[in-house]
Amino acid sequence: MERARRKTMKSLLILLTIAALLAIIALAAIHAYVKNAYRNRIITPDQAMELNPDCILILGARVWDTGPGPMLADRLLQGIELYKAGVSDRLLVSGDHGTKEYDEVNAMKNYAIEHGVPSEHIFMDHAGFSTYDSMYRARDVFQVKKVIIVTKEFHLYRSLYIANKLGLDAYGVASDLRPYARQEYVEIREVLARIKDFFKVAIQPEPTYLGDPIPIDGNGDATND
């Protein structure tokens, strides 16, 4: 009896080990697919000049009491550089403005204005609570069809995957202008986010908030609060 029980336990352990290995392989394959599916759409600022997108979409990140943190400031600088080069005359800044106390998008818009971009050319997406929400809302709220996304290179892989799978004609310009604190931790989190968003894109739920259309070819001050 004891011998049979041990044999059963051994067989179960082998099956669980095989299942775990298969799950790890599947997740690794999903991660690699998301990372590589649209990496050929990561382009240089010079290449962006040829595309005539509806807007330049700058994705949010941490803001401090004094304004954008280093990572977000570099995203903004890269997006503003593209704007001033004539890639597009519309900026869409998308981030978290879920509370009065924390507001990424007004900090982003103010920064862009301080760097010479007219207020009416800057649209704020106050409900860009995730990369998925930002892309979905760019398409459905701001009526964007073709877009240049500006964010860190490691974030562009997932951003471009989501955007293109949602039907946007999306390209990306990286904003890697310097080393950042906790870079390794952020990149590990990004691996998990790629896997999560693979399944989210497959289901395509609505974002946290939608709302009435605000066409990107209108006046950005319509998004002021």
Predicted regions mapped to residue ranges:
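A general structural signal for short secondary-structure boundary/capping elements
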Residues: 99-104, 171, 193-200, 217-222
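A structural signal for short, hydrophobic/glycine-enriched beta-strand patches
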Residues: 29-188
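General helical structural elements
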Residues: 7-9, 79, 162, 193, ...
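Residue-level signal for alpha-helical transmembrane segments in multi-pass membrane proteins
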Residues: 23-33, 57, 196-203
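Short linear elements at protein peripheries
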Residues: 205-225
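A transmembrane-helix-recognition feature enriched in membrane-embedded lipid enzymes
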Residues: 187-209
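N-terminal type II signal-anchor transmembrane helix
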Residues: 3-46
